[in-house]
C-alpha cells in the first residue's frame, strides 16, 4: 500500500508499478513465496507492541506477516485490480521468465495472534487498490527510474558520492 517513504523494490509494489507504468507485468520464476503485510497493519503491530504488557513480549520473537503467496499469485491480483482501477488498460500481460533467484520466504504468524490477538485487517488486493489511487493522484514521480523508491539503488548512489 501507500507509504510516505514509498518503496518499489517490494514484490506487490514493484509488480503494481510495472503494471501501471509499463502496462505489463514481468514475473521472474513466479513460484517463490513471499509473506505480505500491509504497511498500515505493520503500523498497528508497532502500536500493539508499544502498549503490550512487557511480561507478554519481553525476550520474545514474533513473526508478523500475512498471506504467504507466490509471486505468480500476487501478479494475478495486481493484474485484476489494475485493469479494474485503470479502465483504459484492457489487458495487462503477465510475462513469466526463468529466474536464477529462487529465494522463497514464508512465515507463520500464529504466535502473535495467540499472545497478542493480532490479526491483519488489510489484504494484498487492498494494497494494490491504494497504490492505484496514489498513482492516479500523481504521488510518485518517475517511479520506474527514480532511485528514491529503490533501497539498493539509492544506497549505491549515496555510497558512490
Question: Where are the model-predicted features located?
Answer:
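C-terminal substrate-binding subdomain of Rossmann-fold SDR/epimerase-dehydratase oxidoreductases
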Residues: 22-23, 27-161
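Active-site Tyr-X1-5-Lys
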Residues: 17-21
Amino acid at each position: 500500500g501507500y507509504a510516505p517513504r514509498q518503496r518499489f523494490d517490494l514484490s506487490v509494489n514493484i509488480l503494481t508499478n510495472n503494471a501501471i507504468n509499463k502496462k505489463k507485468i514481468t514475473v521472474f520464476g513466479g513460484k517463490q513465496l513471499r509473506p505480505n503485510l500491509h504497511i498500515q497493519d505493520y503500523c498497528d503491530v508497532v502500536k500493539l507492541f508499544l502498549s503490550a504488557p512487557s511480561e507478554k513480549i519481553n525476550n520474545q520473537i514474533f513473526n508478523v506477516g500475512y498471506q504467504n503467496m507466490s509471486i505468480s499469485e500476487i501478479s494475478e491480483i495486481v493484474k485484476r485490480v489494475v485493469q479494474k482501477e485503470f479502465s483504459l488498460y484492457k489487458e495487462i500481460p503477465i510475462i513469466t521468465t526463468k529466474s536464477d533467484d529462487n529465494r522463497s520466504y514464508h512465515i507463520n504468524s500464529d504466535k502473535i495472534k495467540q499472545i497478542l490477538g493480532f490479526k491483519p485487517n488489510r489484504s494484498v488486493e487492498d494494497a494494490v487498490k491504494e497504490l492505484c489511487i496514489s498513482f492516479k493522484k500523481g504521488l510518485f514521480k518517475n517511479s520506474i527510474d527514480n532511485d528514491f523508491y529503490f533501497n539498493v539503488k539509492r544506497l549505491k548512489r549515496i555510497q558512490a558520492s
